[in-house]
A protein has these predicted regions:
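Acidic, Mg2+-coordinating catalytic module of metal-dependent nucleases/exonucleases
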Residues: 115, 121, 126-200, 207
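Conserved DEDDh/DEDDy metal-dependent 3′-5′ exonuclease domain
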Residues: 45-136
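N-terminal accessory regions of nucleic-acid-interacting proteins
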Residues: 1-11
Length: 276
């Protein structure tokens, strides 16, 4: 991306995107029949949904989406790098008439979510993150009556065959909840990344945060967070990983004394030659 970390973190640049499709496998025969987008404006989240009532409306849906893509530099999705965006690129290619306006940057929040919360939660599905990380009571809605994603394609096929449009209301609601959850998740992740010390007390979350900063090349910050994670307490396996990462960072920064001390601890505790 041509944008700096600071520019990526500006909510005014974000366009949230989520699609509902005729299949979950992707491929040239899969359509995005509902494309939802959202953005922050005037202190609130604006949500817009483009619905394809029949296949001949695909061009209009993609044109409307393209106009929105032109207005924001940073596309924000959840698993969008693997699913939503490749699918939309395929649909743009199939219609031929429209060239997609590729965003300057694409933030797929699935990846930082895995780093931050998979060790604690196991599943990092958006609905799980809403419940256990974001807090449904703070969000102002719950997924209690939400529809299962696997049922959505059939509801659309039934509608195309002349069925009642009423079941689609739940699909629209599901898409809107995904967008609102995505916006809340972006705020949470960037809040963690931007805070000097972080409103974080959970050792596993601190460990995930330290790994993100480590990958971004921010060694000093990563080192401090690894130390905080160890102080907060980690499961044995993760504790060993944190010490190993700290030892590697110390060695790269020329602090051979600390690196040797950490490797010594690891060797004593794990009785593993891998520490060396």
């Amino acid at each position: 991306s041509s944008l700096s970390h600071q520019e990526l973190a500006e909510p005014a640049r974000w366009l949230f995107l989520d699609t509902e499709t005729t299949g979950l496998a992707g491929g040239t025969g899969t359509y995005a029949f509902l494309v939802g987008v959202a953005w922050w404006e005037a202190g609130g989240l604006q949500v817009e949904q483009f619905f394809m009532r029949d296949h001949d409306e695909e061009h209009a849906v993609l044109t409307a989406l393209n106009d929105r893509l032109a207005e924001r530099q940073v596309l924000v999705t959840f698993n969008g790098k693997s699913f939503d965006w490749p699918l939309l690129e395929t649909r743009f290619t199939m219609t031929r008439a429209i060239r997609p306006r590729a965003p300057a940057a694409h933030l797929d929040l699935l990846h930082p979510a895995r780093q931050l919360w998979r060790l604690r939660l196991g599943s990092v599905r958006l609905s799980e993150l809403e419940r256990h990380v974001l807090g449904a009571e703070r969000l102002g809605w719950t997924r209690q009556h939400d529809i299962e994603s696997a049922l959505i394609p059939q509801i659309y096929f039934d509608f195309l065959r002349g069925g009642s449009p009423e079941p689609l209301a739940r699909v629209f609601q599901h898409n809107q909840m995904d967008l609102r959850g995505l916006a809340a998740l972006a705020g949470r992740i960037f809040g963690l990344l931007d805070s000097a010390n972080g409103p974080v007390s959970d050792g596993l979350e601190l460990f995930g945060l330290s790994r993100i900063h480590h990958r971004r090349g921010e060694a000093v910050r990563a080192q401090r967070l690894y130390d905080q994670a160890l102080d907060a307490g980690l499961p044995k396996r993760v504790d060993v990983s944190a010490r190993r990462e700290l030892a590697l960072l110390a060695r790269r920064q020329g602090d051979y004394e600390r690196a040797a001390s950490l490797w010594g601890q690891l060797a004593d505790e794990t009785k593993s030659i891998e520490a060396y």
